[in-house]
Curated annotation (Swiss-Prot):
It is found in: Host cytoplasm; Virion. The gene is vif. InterPro entries: Vir_infectivity_fact_Lentivir. The keyword Lyase does not apply. This is Virion infectivity factor. Pfam families: Lentivirus_VIF (PF05851). Keywords: Host cytoplasm, Virion.
């Protein structure tokens, strides 16, 4: 990298800390030949910040894979469904709750949803990546001080079919108390992940008793329209996770 390129990159990074809008203003003021290069660098930095933020939240919740999106205008409940429409296929239901509903109740990571499986992702009414290191949205499983009602929304509900999930043990299977084939392959995999130790023969045996998870591909036709977008905002789960990932996943 030349000295000149390094100066541009350093300035861009400094502006990025001030927010997306400032960074885009800075890029638009550059000569046309430099704009494309800076846009690519800018998008890469946004992606890294988003990915790191999402990874930390998913790790705290034990979510191995998930759908996520951001919307600047969160004014009402929106539902998005990703997955195949075929019977017995895995579907992903995402409900974005209205932040105004949290005037008196703001759920935290430890108390917002008792039903499993679930997916959750924090959504704020600003840019998720603006000065993200100092936002300190969540601490100890609860929303941090300074985030008032209406400032944080939450994506609720599960990626799975409508079959009820229960707590399972190998003993229940051996005694014939439950029939693993009553659940689709995806549901059985999720329950095995939840209630069996990772990297054990016990988990492999439980998974082998159920149906094979069918291949599926997401086909979400809806998009959240907003002028404040990056390519990362359109990320959708496209393919079913591989079985080896499910086998070794730790919740």
């Amino acid at each position: 990298m030349s000295d000149e390129d390094w100066q541009v990159s350093r300035r861009l990074f400094a502006v990025l800390q001030g927010g997306v809008y400032s960074a885009m203003l800075y890029i638009s003021s550059l000569p046309e030949m430099e704009q494309d290069k800076c846009k690519r660098s800018f998008k890469k930095r946004l992606s890294e910040k988003e990915t790191g933020f999402i990874f930390r939240l998913r790790k705290a919740e034990g979510i191995r894979w998930s759908f996520h999106t951001r919307d600047y205008y969160i004014g009402y409940v929106r539902e998005m469904v990703a997955g195949s429409s075929l019977p017995d296929s895995l579907r992903l239901y995402v409900y974005i709750s209205n932040p105004l509903w949290h005037q008196s109740y703001r759920p935290g990571l430890t108390n917002f949803n008792t039903e499993w499986p679930f997916v959750n992702m924090w959504i704020k009414t600003g840019f998720m990546w603006d000065d993200i290191e100092s936002q300190n949205i969540c601490k100890g499983g609860e929303i941090s001080h300074g985030w008032g009602p209406g400032m944080v929304g939450i994506v609720i509900k599960a990626f799975s079919c409508g079959e009820r999930k229960i707590k399972i043990t190998p003993v229940m299977i051996i005694r014939g108390e439950i029939d693993p084939t009553e659940w689709c392959g995806d549901c059985w995999n999720l329950m095995c992940l939840k209630y069996s130790p990772p990297n054990t023969l016990q988990r492999l045996a439980m998974l082998a008793c159920g149906k094979e998870a069918k291949e599926w591909r997401g086909c979400c036709n809806q998009r959240f329209v907003s002028p404040f977008r990056t390519p990362c905002d359109l990320e959708v789960v496209q393919n079913k996770p591989k079985r080896n990932l499910l086998w070794t996943g730790e919740l």
